[in-house]
A protein has these predicted regions:
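Conserved SGNH/GDSL esterase-like catalytic core that processes O-acyl groups on lipids
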Residues: 23-24, 31, 36-38, 46-134
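Charged helix-capping and loop-helix junction motifs
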Residues: 105-106, 137-146
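Alpha-helical structural signal in soluble globular domains
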Residues: 73-81, 146, 150, 154, ...
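Second-shell loop/turn segments in exported
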Residues: 57-65, 133-137, 161-164, 207-211
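Active-site segments of SGNH/GDSL-like serine hydrolases
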Residues: 123-132, 145-177
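Catalytic His-Asp segment of secreted/periplasmic serine-dependent ester chemistry enzymes
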Residues: 165-231
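N-terminal secretory targeting modules
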Residues: 1-40, 44-63, 76, 80-85, ...
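Conserved beta-strand segments of alpha/beta enzyme cores
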Residues: 87-89, 158, 183-185
Length: 231
């Protein structure tokens, strides 16, 4: 039996067609903002409406509204910490998870605007959709390192990498080792699923959607991230 949590196994949300490719990168700029934060993620970061699985939002899956997903809660908490507005960019990179073995090809095809954003802080919150069988034959760590290098185009960028929201040891060890080697900040969030309140169980009929972070879970992710952002 595969060594992953039951919630990871329950995630039957497809890794493909999570968002219209023309919307993979979205930049939000605010008057007077200086700091630029880039979020690189998957459905937990943003997923377009998909009524066939009971999802009607266009933000981090299972959050009740855009303001409650971890991206927007992170920005809000960071603005409170700084006392000023924050610009941010969202790169929905499930495409990388599916095609990581292709190197820069998917990155150059879809994510150049996020690279050229030259963020001050790059948050890598991704991994749940990496095919574990493929990863056994072709470990994703090298591709992860190249992906981070691609997005962290600002030489002074601070990089934050998290483990998986659902416990997937096979991937977590690679992410943590890469962070340690390159001096990235590694933030653990994988323990959050031990608290059922962090997931949207009972709020959606589709088990995969319901396994995604609830508003409370999104807040906890945001708090962990902001705790490690030194300003």
């Amino acid at each position: 039996m595969e060594n992953i949590s039951k919630n990871a196994a329950a995630n039957t949300v497809s890794a493909v067609h999570q968002l219209d490719p023309t919307k993979y990168v979205r930049i939000t700029e605010k008057p007077g903002a200086k700091l630029k934060v880039l979020f690189v993620g998957n459905s937990i970061t943003r997923h377009m409406p998909l009524p066939s699985i009971g999802w009607t939002g266009d933000w981090g899956m299972a959050a009740s509204c855009e303001e409650k997903d971890y991206v927007h809660q992170t920005v809000r908490l960071l603005e409170e910490k700084l006392g000023e507005p924050v610009n941010f960019c969202v790169a929905q990179a499930a495409e990388w998870e599916v095609h990581y073995e292709e190197g820069e090809k998917p990155l150059l095809e879809y994510y150049i605007p996020a690279r050229d954003y030259r963020a001050d802080i790059v948050i890598i919150r991704i991994g749940e959709n990496v095919n574990r069988e493929k990863d056994k034959l072709n470990p994703c760590r090298g591709s992860l390192e190249k992906m981070v290098e691609f997005f962290a185009s600002n030489p002074d960028a601070r990089v934050i990498v998290t483990d998986n929201f659902w416990d997937i040891p096979q991937l977590n060890v690679q992410f943590e080792a890469a962070a340690k080697e390159h001096g990235w900040t590694f933030v653990k969030i994988g323990d959050l699923e031990k608290d059922e309140r962090t997931m949207a169980k009972g709020l959606f009929w589709h088990e995969g959607v319901a396994s995604h972070p609830s508003d409370y879970g999104m807040l906890k992710i945001a708090e962990r991230l902001v705790e490690h952002i030194k300003v």
